[in-house]
């Protein structure tokens, strides 16, 4: 009886193994797999064409960094221009960010152009701190960082073009100038503060000096001396006596 059962089981297993395989288990290279592969390839090719057309109609947006470099000056400055210390001035700064506080830790203003200087002076009148009680300045001055300075006078009195943005080693630096001006030509009704108005006429005026700045000469960058405002002084003259 047991031998008969074993024989039936073996015959049943042999029948299962001999049955034809379904299309789901067709080996690679069979017609079913080829059709599926062709369909997949066609869909992939169609997807690639669609993505290419989409990219052409809607190009990828440029990075902000690339846009910033594109808007900067096209002239690339040779780094060797900055290696000589005699060309450096404490009132000229090249930076990628607005300058911080001044060296004496006084608050200074940041200007985008020279036209806003008068507006900022009227809007924000910040006096220099008094170091000791009872000490006053003859003239009141204000110091500002000036950016976007495009025109200036050179040491020969000729107008020159000042470089605003400098492309150095694929980095865009802005050229800043630390300028000092008189806040008011007459800090007191009689003129300069502390001057005997009975014998002297006085008024405050802004004086200039020369600093080395990076300027444009044709299509090349070069160092030149230019005039900028650097101090506020008192000018006095003796009053004439009427006889």
UniProtKB/Swiss-Prot annotation:
Does the entry feature the keyword Glycoprotein, yes or no?
Answer: yes
Pfam families this protein is in?
NGF
Which residues does the annotation flag as glycosylated?
148
Where is the protein situated, by its record's location annotation?
Answer: Secreted
Q: Name one GO cellular component term.
A: dendrite
The tissues in which it is expressed are: Expressed by the venom gland.
**Lineage of the species this protein comes from:** Eukaryota, Metazoa, Chordata, Craniata, Vertebrata
User: Is the Signal keyword given for this protein?
Assistant: yes
Q: Which family does it belong to?
A: Belongs to the NGF-beta family.
**Keywords per UniProt:** Cleavage on pair of basic residues, Disulfide bond, Glycoprotein, Growth factor, Lipid-binding, Metalloenzyme inhibitor, Metalloprotease inhibitor, Protease inhibitor, Secreted, Signal, Toxin
| Recorded superkingdom | Eukaryota
Specify the protein name: Venom nerve growth factor 1
Q: For this UniProt entry, which residues form the secretion signal?
A: 1-18
**Can you give the propeptide residue ranges?**
19-125
Tell me which species this is from. Answer: Oxyuranus microlepidotus (Inland taipan)
> What role does it play?
Nerve growth factor is important for the development and maintenance of the sympathetic and sensory nervous systems. It stimulates division and differentiation of sympathetic and embryonic sensory neurons as well as basal forebrain cholinergic neurons in the brain. Its relevance in the snake venom is not clear. However, it has been shown to inhibit metalloproteinase-dependent proteolysis of platelet glycoprotein Ib alpha, suggesting a metalloproteinase inhibition to prevent metalloprotease autodigestion and/or protection against prey proteases.
Q: Where is the composition biased (Basic and acidic residues)?
A: 47-66
SS bonds (residue pairs): 139-204, 182-232, 192-234
């Amino acid at each position: 009886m047991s031998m008969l059962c074993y024989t039936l089981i073996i015959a049943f297993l042999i029948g299962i193994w001999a049955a034809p395989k379904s299309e789901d288990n067709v080996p690679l290279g069979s017609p079913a797999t080829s059709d599926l592969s062709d369909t997949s390839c066609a869909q992939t090719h169609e997807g690639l064409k669609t993505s290419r057309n989409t990219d052409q109609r809607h190009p990828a947006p440029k990075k902000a960094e690339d846009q910033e470099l594109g808007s900067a000056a096209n002239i690339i400055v040779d780094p060797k221009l900055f290696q000589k210390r005699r060309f450096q001035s404490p009132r000229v700064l090249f930076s990628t960010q607005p300058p911080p506080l001044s060296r004496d830790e006084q608050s200074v203003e940041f200007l985008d152009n020279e036209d806003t200087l008068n507006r900022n002076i009227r809007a924000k009148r910040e006096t220099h701190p008094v170091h000791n009680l009872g000490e006053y300045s003859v003239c009141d001055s204000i110091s500002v960082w000036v950016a976007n300075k495009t025109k200036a006078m050179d040491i020969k009195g000729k107008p020159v073009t000042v470089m605003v943005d400098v492309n150095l080693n694929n980095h865009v630096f802005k050229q800043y100038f630390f300028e000092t001006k008189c806040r008011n030509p007459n800090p007191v009704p009689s003129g300069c503060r502390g001057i005997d108005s009975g014998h002297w006429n006085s008024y405050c005026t802004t004086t200039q000096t020369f600093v080395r700045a990076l300027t444009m000469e044709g299509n090349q960058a070069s160092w030149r001396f230019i005039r900028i405002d650097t101090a506020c002084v008192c000018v006095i003259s003796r009053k004439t006596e009427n006889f």
